[in-house]
Amino acid sequence: MNASEPTTADFRTCSDPVKWIDRKNVIIDTTMLRDDDGWWYRASKDSEITIERTRNPYAVAREVLRTDDPNEWSFVGTLTDLLGNGRYSEHYLEGPELFVFNDDDVATVNGRPMRYGLMCDQYAEGKGYTPFRSADLGSRDPLDWAAADDIDFGRLKKRHGAILPITEAEYEAIEDTFAN
């Protein structure tokens, strides 16, 4: 199944689409995040929630593989590999969304500050998003990954969407504006 990417500089015109993910299995959802160290990370819903990294986000990924070439997409792992729970497979999760936590929201787990977040929609069970934390998105060490069971989304189920970190002051301004 192919995923194509057009590019735009003005959001009025787009380039012709080019293959971006060209694999035999289905890819239905993909999210990307650029880290301060210049690496791009991507989480995709294929047969698992698959995590990859590259320095060239335009590289075409033809198969899931580990490579030392920084200009190709290199396989980091799947949520099942990293967290060891079969309920993280294609049958349970989709809609991954990567993000960076605000400094005040970074939790320490296993003695490691977990700066990054990954949310996935538990579509098969109709439960909405389930959150995860990572100290290092490029790490295959299970100690750098954890389920974020302490995050409370309230009663309203959260489904496919985007994460926009805001400060406490921004949150309060939104609350004040829309309180009534």
Can you name each region flagged by the protein language model?
Residues 1-180:
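Carbohydrate-active catalytic/glycan-binding domains of CAZyme proteins
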